[in-house]
C-alpha cells in the first residue's frame, strides 16, 4: 500500500541526547537505547471516516519520536498498518451504500493527504490488513498447532480464539487487573459473551464467514481476521520480535496491544514482543471527550479546508504533554497560530540570542519523554527576544529554524 511523500528533514549538528520514554508496561520513563536501526510499529486507522484530531495527536507523537531518533543518528524502520478489514468499516459502508473497499480506499487516501499536510514522516512499510491475510492465516495456524488457540464448538460458525492463558506473562503490557480487563474488553470490540469460549477474555483470531461479510479461504475454513492478530502478523513479519517501540493511542493499551503482543509471544516463545510500549493520551473538545457517539469530532481535513495552517495544528497539539489528556478549542488554535507567527518572525530576524544553546535545550527537553511544553516555552522566550531586541548571534535564527524543522516538523515558512 502506498503511503505519502515524506518531507525533507534537515541534518542537525551538535551532540545527541539519548531518548527516554514512558513505558506503559513498566509504568516508568526508560531509556530507549536502540541499535543503528530502530524498529517502531504504530497502529493505524480503521478507514471509515476522516482523520480527527485524536488520530493526529497520536501520529504526531510518534512523528516526534521518529524525528528525535533520526536526529540522534539512528535509522528508523517505521511500520504502520491500516485496519481495512473491520466491522466499523463494513457498517459505515452499508449505511452509506458504498462498497467497503471503495470507502476504505477513499478514507485512506484522505488520511495520507492529512499526514502529508501535517508533515508527518511516512512509514517505510504501510500495510493494509487485506494485504496481510496470508500472514494472518499462517500465524493462526501456528497458534492452533501449538495449542495457544482453539476452535469453538459451533458447527455453523467455527471461529478460532486465542487462549488468554497461553502465556504466563499475559497482562504485563497493560498492568490491568482482571476486572479492568473485562470492562475494556467489552467496551473495545471484544465478545465476552460469545458461547463456546473457554474464557470471556479469549480474543478472536479468525472469524468464520458470515452471510454478507467478506471472507478469504483458509485451512480453518473461509473467514476473516480478528483485529489483534492483524497487527501481530504485520509487525512480526517486518520487525521481528524485540523491536524498540510498539505505539498507539492510550485506548489501545487493552485489549489491542496486550493481545497483539501475546499472540506473537505465544507463537515464538519470546517473553516480550516489543521493548517499549508507548501510548498517547486522548484529545477532547471544549472540555468533553472527542468521540463519534458525541458527534464532536474535529477533522484535520475540515480545518485545512477552512484555511488553518497545518503547522498551527501541530503546535496546538504539542501545547500539552503527549501523555496528558487534553482539550482542543478555538483558543488553543489561536494560541498556536500566534506562536507560529512569533517564531516565523524570529526566524526572519537579523540576529538572535544564542541559537546553538537553545537547540541543545530543545534536544534535551524532547529526549526527556517528549517534553513539548518545555520546548515550546523555551522557543517562545527565545523568539520574543529575537523579535524585540535581537541578540549577539547572527546565525541564531537559521540555526533554530533548522532545529524546529528537524525536531518539531514545523516549516520555517507558511
From Swiss-Prot:
Cysteines paired by S-S bonds: none
The reaction(s) this protein catalyses: 1D-myo-inositol 2-amino-2-deoxy-alpha-D-glucopyranoside + L-cysteine + ATP = 1D-myo-inositol 2-(L-cysteinylamino)-2-deoxy-alpha-D-glucopyranoside + AMP + diphosphate + H(+)
Annotated residues for binding of L-cysteinyl-5'-AMP: 43-46, 58, 81-83, 227, 249-251, 283
First-level EC class: ligase
A GO term for molecular function: cysteine-tRNA ligase activity
UniProt cross-references to Gene3D superfamilies, sorted A to Z: Anticodon-binding domain of a subclass of class I aminoacyl-tRNA synthetases, HUPs
Motif ('KMSKS' region): 289-293
Motif ('HIGH' region): 45-55
CDD domains in the record: Anticodon_Ia_Cys_like (cd07955), CysRS_core (cd00672)
List of residues binding Zn(2+): 43, 231, 256
Quaternary structure (record): Monomer.
PANTHER family per record: CYSTEINE--TRNA LIGASE, CYTOPLASMIC, CYSTEINYL-TRNA SYNTHETASE
Matches recorded under NCBIfam families: mycothiol_MshC
Its biological purpose: Catalyzes the ATP-dependent condensation of GlcN-Ins and L-cysteine to form L-Cys-GlcN-Ins.
Official protein name in the record: L-cysteine:1D-myo-inositol 2-amino-2-deoxy-alpha-D-glucopyranoside ligase
Protein source organism: Tsukamurella paurometabola (strain ATCC 8368 / DSM 20162 / CCUG 35730 / CIP 100753 / JCM 10117 / KCTC 9821 / NBRC 16120 / NCIMB 702349 / NCTC 13040) (Corynebacterium paurometabolum)
Gene: mshC
Amino acid at each position: 500500500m502506498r503511503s505519502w511523500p515524506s518531507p525533507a528533514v534537515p541534518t542537525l549538528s551538535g551532540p545527541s541526547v539519548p531518548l527516554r520514554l514512558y513505558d506503559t508496561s513498566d509504568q516508568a520513563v526508560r531509556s530507549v537505547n536502540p541499535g543503528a536501526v530502530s524498529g517502531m510499529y504504530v497502529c493505524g486507522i480503521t478507514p471509515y471516516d476522516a482523520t480527527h484530531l485524536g488520530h493526529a495527536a497520536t501520529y504526531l507523537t510518534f512523528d516526534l519520536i521518529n524525528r528525535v531518533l533520526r536526529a540522534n543518528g539512528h535509522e528508523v524502520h517505521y511500520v504502520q498498518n491500516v485496519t481495512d478489514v473491520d466491522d466499523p468499516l463494513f457498517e459505515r459502508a452499508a449505511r452509506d451504500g458504498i462498497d467497503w473497499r471503495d470507502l476504505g480506499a477513499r478514507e485512506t487516501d484522505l488520511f495520507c493527504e492529512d499526514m502529508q499536510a501535517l508533515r508527518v514522516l511516512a512509514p517505510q512499510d504501510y500495510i493494509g490488513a487485506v494485504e496481510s491475510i496470508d500472514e494472518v492465516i499462517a500465524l493462526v495456524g501456528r497458534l492452533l498447532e501449538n495449542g495457544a488457540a482453539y476452535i469453538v464448538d459451533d458447527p455453523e460458525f467455527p471461529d478460532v480464539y486465542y487462549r488468554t492463558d497461553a502465556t504466563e506473562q499475559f497482562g504485563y503490557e497493560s498492568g490491568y487487573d482482571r476486572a479492568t480487563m473485562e470492562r475494556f474488553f467489552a467496551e473495545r470490540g471484544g465478545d465476552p459473551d460469545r458461547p463456546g469460549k473457554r474464557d470471556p477474555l479469549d480474543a478472536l483470531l479468525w472469524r468464520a464467514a458470515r452471510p454478507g461479510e467478506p471472507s478469504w479461504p483458509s485451512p480453518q475454513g473461509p473467514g476473516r481476521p480478528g483485529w489483534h492478530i492483524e497487527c501481530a502478523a504485520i509487525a512480526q513479519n517486518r520487525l521481528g520480535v524485540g523491536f524498540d517501540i510498539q505505539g498507539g493511542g492510550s485506548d489501545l493499551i487493552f485489549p489491542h496491544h496486550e493481545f497483539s503482543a501475546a499472540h506473537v509471544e505465544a507463537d515464538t516463545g519470546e517473553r516480550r514482543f516489543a521493548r517499549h510500549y508507548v501510548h498517547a493520551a486522548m484529545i477532547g473538545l471544549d472540555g468533553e471527550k472527542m468521540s463519534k457517539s458525541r458527534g464532536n469530532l474535529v477533522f484535520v481535513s475540515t480545518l485545512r479546508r477552512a484555511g488553518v495552517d497545518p503547522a498551527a495544528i501541530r503546535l496546538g497539539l504539542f501545547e500539552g504533554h503527549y501523555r496528558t489528556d487534553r482539550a482542543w478549542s478555538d483558543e488553543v488554535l489561536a494560541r498556536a497560530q500566534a506562536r507560529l507567527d512569533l517564531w516565523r518572525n524570529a526566524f526572519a530576524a537579523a540576529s538572535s540570542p544564542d541559537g546553538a544553546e537553545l537547540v541543545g535545550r530543545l534536544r534535551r527537553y524532547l529526549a526527556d519523554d517528549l517534553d513539548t511544553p518545555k520546548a515550546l516555552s523555551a522557543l517562545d522566550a527565545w523568539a520574543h527576544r529575537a523579535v524585540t531586541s535581537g541578540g549577539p548571534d547572527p546565525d541564531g535564527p537559521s540555526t533554530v529554524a533548522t532545529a524546529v524543522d528537524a525536531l518539531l516538523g514545523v516549516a520555517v515558512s507558511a
